[in-house]
C-alpha cells in the first residue's frame, strides 16, 4: 500500500490515535491514486498534476468509489488550516519575534545532535590556549542545511567556525581552505594546509559531504567522502599526529583515515548556530552524545 493511500497510517494512527488536525500532502511525485488517497486521508497531491487529479476525483465520486461526504470532509479539513493560517498571517503582520531566542534554540538543538565518534588520548575537549590550525572549506562556508524541499530561511546569517573561534579560548594559528568542495584535489591548497598543520598543537579539519555528494531525488552509489578531502586528511596526519576531524553530512560515510586521527566529531547539518554549537563541544562547554 502506498503511504499516501494508507488508511491505517493516515487515519487510524495520524488522526484517531495522535489527534492530528492538519492536512496531508503527498511527497513530490509520491501520489499514485489521488482519489484513493483522498478516500483514505490524504488532501493535497504535489506537485500539481493539472486537471488529471481533479478528473480522477470527479470520476471516483460519480462511480461511487469516493463518497461525496468524504470529499467534503477532506475539503473542510484543508480549509480549516487555510483559514487559520491566513488569520495568523493577518494578526502577526508587523509584529516582531525574538531573533536571538530562535538562534539560541537552534544552537541548543545543534549541541544535542553532535556525536563524538573517536577521542583517543582524550584529545578533546581542547584546553584554553591550545594552538589550533583550522583547515577546510566547511570551516569558512559551513554546510548547515540540506537543499531542495528541505531549504529554509535562517533567522540570521549562519555562523562559521571562523566567526566564533575568537571567543572560544583557543589560539588559531592559521586557517587554510585545503580543498574546494565539489572539485578535484588542489595541490596548492593542500600544500598550504599541510604547512599550517605543522605549527599547531592540534589540527581541526572540517570535512564532510557537499551539496552535490548527497541530495534529494537520488541514491548515493557509494559512501566515500570526496577524494580531495580524504587525501588532505592523509597528508595532514603525516605531519601532525594530533588531528581532529569535524564532519558535516546528512548521512553515513566511510572514514579510511579513522585509525590515523585522534578525534572525530560528527555535527551532521548543524543549522544556523551549528558553528558555535560545535565549538562548545570541542572546548568542553557541552558534552556530546
Where are these regions (language model features)?
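Long, well-ordered, tryptophan-enriched scaffold segments
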Residues: 41, 59-89
Amino acid at each position: 500500500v502506498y503511504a499516501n493511500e494508507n488508511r491505517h497510517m493516515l487515519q487510524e494512527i495520524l488522526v484517531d490515535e495522535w489527534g492530528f488536525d492538519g492536512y496531508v500532502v503527498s511527497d513530490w511525485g509520491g501520489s499514485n491514486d489521488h482519489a484513493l488517497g483522498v478516500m483514505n486521508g490524504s488532501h493535497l497531491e504535489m506537485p500539481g498534476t493539472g486537471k488529471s487529479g481533479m478528473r480522477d476525483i470527479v470520476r471516483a465520486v460519480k462511480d461511487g468509489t469516493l463518497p461525496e461526504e468524504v470529499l467534503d470532509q477532506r475539503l473542510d479539513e484543508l480549509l480549516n488550516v487555510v483559514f487559520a493560517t491566513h488569520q495568523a498571517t493577518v494578526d502577526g503582520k508587523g509584529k516582531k519575534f525574538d531573533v536571538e531566542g530562535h538562534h539560541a534554540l537552534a544552537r541548543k538543538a545543534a549541541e544535542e545532535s553532535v556525536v563524538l565518534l573517536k577521542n583517543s588520548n582524550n584529545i578533546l575537549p581542547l584546553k584554553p590556549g591550545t594552538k589550533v590550525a583550522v583547515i577546510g572549506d566547511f570551516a569558512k562556508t559551513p554546510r548547515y542545511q540540506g537543499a531542495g524541499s528541505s531549504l529554509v530561511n535562517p533567522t540570521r546569517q549562519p555562523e562559521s567556525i571562523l566567526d566564533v573561534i575568537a571567543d572560544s579560548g583557543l589560539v588559531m594559528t592559521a586557517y587554510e581552505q585545503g580543498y574546494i568542495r565539489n572539485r578535484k584535489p588542489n595541490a596548492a591548497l593542500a600544500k598550504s594546509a599541510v604547512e599550517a598543520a605543522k605549527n599547531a598543537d592540534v589540527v581541526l579539519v572540517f570535512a564532510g559531504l557537499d551539496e552535490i555528494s548527497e541530495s534529494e531525488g537520488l541514491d548515493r552509489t557509494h559512501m566515500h567522502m570526496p577524494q580531495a578531502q580524504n587525501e588532505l586528511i592523509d597528508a595532514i596526519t603525516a605531519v601532525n599526529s594530533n588531528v581532529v576531524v569535524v564532519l558535516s553530512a546528512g548521512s553515513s560515510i566511510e572514514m579510511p583515515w579513522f585509525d590515523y586521527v585522534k578525534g572525530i566529531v560528527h555535527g551532521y547539518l548543524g543549522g544556523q548556530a551549528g558553528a558555535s554549537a560545535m565549538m562548545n563541544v570541542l572546548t568542553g562547554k557541552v558534552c556530546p552524545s
